[in-house]
Every structure is written in C-alpha cells, then in structure tokens.
Swiss-Prot record:
Lineage: Eukaryota, Fungi, Dikarya, Ascomycota, Pezizomycotina
Subcellular location: Secreted; Secreted, Cell wall
Disruption phenotype: Does not seem to affect germination and growth, formation of sclerotia, ability to penetrate and infect host tissue, nor spore and mycelium surface properties.
Keyword Disulfide bond (UniProt): yes
Keywords, comma-separated and alphabetical: Cell wall, Disulfide bond, Secreted, Signal
Cysteine disulfide partners in this protein: 35-85, 43-79, 44-63, 86-97
Signal sequence bounds: 1-18
Function as written in the Swiss-Prot or TrEMBL entry: Aerial growth, conidiation, and dispersal of filamentous fungi in the environment rely upon a capability of their secreting small amphipathic proteins called hydrophobins (HPBs) with low sequence identity. Class I can self-assemble into an outermost layer of rodlet bundles on aerial cell surfaces, conferring cellular hydrophobicity that supports fungal growth, development and dispersal; whereas Class II form highly ordered films at water-air interfaces through intermolecular interactions but contribute nothing to the rodlet structure.
Protein name: Class I hydrophobin 1
C-alpha cells in the first residue's frame, strides 16, 4: 500500500512542468493570442540608423516583418534569442521596436502573464 501511494505521488510530481527563468528565452502561452488583435509578433534583429546617438543605435532595434506562429512555441528559438515585439499588421516599412516610437513599435518581448509587450534585456 505504501509503495502504491509513493508511486502515485512520484507520478504526479513528474507531471509538473517547470519553465526556465532564463532572461534571453521567451515562452509563448499555448492556447491563446499573445499579441493584441490586429498585431503581429515580430523578431527584432537589426539596429536603427536614426539620429539617436550611439547608445540609441545600439538599443533601438527594428523589427523585421516576420510573422511567427505564437501558439505553444518557444520564441527564443524562432527569433534566434533576439527580442520580439508586437506590431500593428500592414504597412510597407519595418516597424520600429525602439522606445522613441517614431514608427509606433514597442521594444521588448511578450509578458506571458499579461500578454503585453515588455522591455527585456538586450545582450550586446
């Protein structure tokens, strides 16, 4: 009897899934939209060429318009560990992910608890 109870307890404990807290990896929640309606999740992969100064150019990331399926995937792998952001669909130019909002983008990644864009550390 004790063996059966111990087996059940161990089986239930093995079913718990832990999500790593590594800052460079983002996890999308499976089963729902991550970006707001009318927005697309994009990889931020190039630096801006605007007149924000050296620091602004290093931290001001442009999002390439790459639609990414966002249900149940690890975004860090899809975006090669680059930051991601939500952008309004449409438009002929790449959305801007930096914080000076000259093209209306949002710097950062997705908060899996609130489904909102958040700033994340950028590894240079």
């Amino acid at each position: 009897m004790r063996f059966s109870i111990a087996t059940v307890v161990l089986s239930l404990a093995a079913m718990v899934v832990a999500i790593p807290t590594t800052e460079s990896t983002l996890f999308a929640r499976g089963g729902g939209q991550t970006c707001a309606q009318g927005q697309t999740l994009s990889c931020c992969q190039s630096v801006t060429s605007g007149g924000d100064g050296i620091l602004g150019n290093l931290l001001g990331l442009n999002c390439a318009e790459i639609p990414i399926p966002i249900v149940g995937i690890v975004l860090g792998g899809k975006c090669n560990s680059a930051p991601v952001c939500c952008n309004v669909n449409g438009g002929s130019t790449s959305p801007d992910c930096d914080d000076n909002s000259n093209n209306g983008g949002t710097q950062g990644g997705i908060n899996v608890l609130t489904n909102s864009c958040v700033a994340i550390p950028i590894v240079l």
